[in-house]
Amino acid sequence: MGLKWSKESQVVRLLSYNVEWGFLNLPPDIHGDSCGHPIPNTDIAQQTHLKLIAKNIGFAKPDICFLQEMGSLDAVKYIAAQLDDMFGLVYSCYYSNGEDKGNQGVGLLVENSLLPYSKVINIPNFKLNRALGLTLSMGSIEYKIVGVHLKSLYDRKIKKDEAEQESQIQAVLDWVGDPEKAILCGDFNNIPTSDPIKKVTDASYTGIIDSDKYVPNIIANTYTEFHGKNGKESGSKIDYIFKTDDVELVSSHIIDIQREASKQDPTLRGETSDHLPVLGIFKLN
């Protein structure tokens, strides 16, 4: 049996992970990943990809796990089944696009022993439904936890895209209400000095990677996303977990797993993701 959450300990492990095309059935126009590896459009390639994603999640043993770039509820359930098989971790599954398939959405895994204290909803007015909210009731105290995937800047229409990002952030802030007992996480698709991220920090949220509870990796940077081809990769920090001041942080981590296969197998995908998972460990008291 895997570890179960205990209300007595009040410690919650929260993971945010962009899994890069976490689909059981890829859209027909997707043939490669962000770092230039081809993506075979086969069942075995996608299933192996999701199994490796589940393996990475299982090592972190999160109580709550938000997943970006998921393609369906079935794909979220596939990851959950692998976590049960490999680690004995049992989760309930949620997906921001409901039963719809074929578009990127946000998946959510909630460890089953948390269910009596939890309620999951879609964030109102969040464009493309790429956000889920979790209300966690601890006695008389209510925590709000949100996982998002903000608009990409891939099309390089920066002004337009950042305006949409700020609109999405506002939808989250509106749902949370007063900045108390709240945690925001996900792929925000922008760097720490950008206006959208400043909108979050100006609303009384602090990034946990910027805190004194952050445990650095040996590589000595805080990159969470990587791009570029033919060995010319570069990194940036666009995945975050933010918290209000009244949420106690035990520690925070960027999980520095190996993302790319040392020897490429043409029948499988060349990397698990162009992102690294971000883990926050909190004491909810």
Q: Residue ranges of each PLM-predicted region?
A:
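Soluble non-cytosolic domains of exported or imported proteins
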Residues: 40-51, 69-73, 125, 159-167, ...
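Active-site environment of divalent metal-dependent phosphoester hydrolases
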Residues: 72-74, 100-103, 153-155, 189-195, ...
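Metal-dependent phosphoester-hydrolase catalytic domains
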Residues: 1-5, 176-182, 189-285
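Structured beta-strand-rich core segments of catalytic domains in phosphoester-bond hydrolases
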Residues: 64, 68-150
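N-terminal, active-site-proximal structural segment of metallo-dependent hydrolase catalytic domains
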Residues: 1-82
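Short, solvent-exposed loop/turn and secondary-structure capping segments
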Residues: 25-28, 77-80, 119-121, 157, ...
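Active-site His/acidic residue clusters
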Residues: 147-160
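Active-site beta-strand/loop signature of hydrolases that rely on acidic residues for catalysis
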Residues: 14-19, 52-77, 134, 145, ...
